[in-house]
A protein has these predicted regions:
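His/acidic metal-ligating clusters that form di-metal
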Residues: 18-20, 98-189
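Conserved beta-sheet core of the metallophosphoesterase superfamily
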Residues: 46-55, 61, 152-236
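Solvent-exposed loop/turn segments at secondary-structure junctions
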Residues: 6-8, 31-34, 59-63, 82-85, ...
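Core catalytic region of metal-dependent phosphoesterases/phosphodiesterases
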Residues: 3, 8-94
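N-terminal low-complexity, Pro/Thr-rich disordered segments
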Residues: 1, 235-249
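Acidic/histidine-rich helix-loop elements
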Residues: 4-8, 32-33, 111-125, 201-207
Length: 249
């Protein structure tokens, strides 16, 4: 299960939990709005959504939010390894999750968050630098992961095109940020964006749907299909659109 952009809307989590129970859950950033300590309480709820829950930060998050998530039991990934509740990073950048190799890159703006008025977007020059940095980071990873989490869909798209230029490369990239459900494929590189689990914020509950995705993997780890799911946060009623990926591109 893949979700992102909760934006402190804890009211949507019970509906998502009906689908995620006893499955690995990948949460691709933006647990908060401002990254404040008060919002960090959402992290404790999110950490128990999956078995396990794997997470990276988004541009609305902060160190205190991500450390709270780690302290509640989630696998919080950074470019250098796994984040601990005390803020230290340890271990390999590539971890094993349910038989799959997974890596994640934190959002650069998360380090500046935690107070009102922090920046929420990169300049064009910063975005170009970030895509170059993430591409170089991926190229240096060993072993090569099956799945990469990166919050900003623009960075994810650049990484998809970069990796697809390699002969025989296969990778699933999980992303978010744009609040739009989509699946994009270049060769054997698949990018999945589940939309926004936050459903437009607390005040839109009952009017906006929670979006997330279910990735159906074949025994060799390749995604056979992706279900893009839209659920009512109150009733749990849902609809899904299936994207088949088991054909040769």
């Amino acid at each position: 299960m893949v979700a992102s952009d909760i934006h402190a809307n804890w009211l949507t989590l019970p509906a998502f939990a009906r689908y995620s129970d006893h499955r690995p859950v990948f949460l691709v950033g933006d647990f908060a709005l401002q990254g404040t300590p008060i919002e960090a309480s959402i992290a404790q709820r999110a950490a128990t959504l999956g078995h396990p829950t794997v997470a990276v930060s988004g541009n609305h998050d902060s160190p205190v939010v991500m450390q709270s998530l780690a302290g509640a039991g989630a696998i919080v990934l950074t470019h250098a390894g796994r984040l601990a509740a005390d803020g230290t990073v340890h271990g390999s950048a590539v971890v094993s999750v349910d038989g799959l190799l997974v890596a994640g890159y934190e959002d650069p703006l998360a380090s500046q968050a935690g107070s009102l008025g922090h920046r929420l977007d990169l300049t064009p020059a910063e975005l170009a630098d970030e895509t170059t940095t993430v591409e170089a980071w991926f190229d240096a990873l060993f072993p090569r992961p099956d799945i990469v989490l990166v919050h900003d869909f623009r960075v994810a798209e650049a990484l998809r095109l970069h990796v697809a230029a390699e002969d025989g490369a296969r990778l699933i990239i999980l992303t978010g940020h744009d609040h739009r459900q989509h699946v994009d494929r270049t060769g054997d590189i698949v990018e999945v964006d589940g939309g926004t689990l936050g459903a437009g914020g607390v005040f839109a509950v009952g009017h906006a749907s929670a979006g997330f995705a279910e990735v159906h993997l074949m025994p060799d780890g390749w995604p056979a299909a992706v279900d893009l799911i839209s659920a009512d946060p109150i009733s749990g009623d849902a609809s899904a659109r299936r994207i088949a990926l088991d054909e040769t591109p």
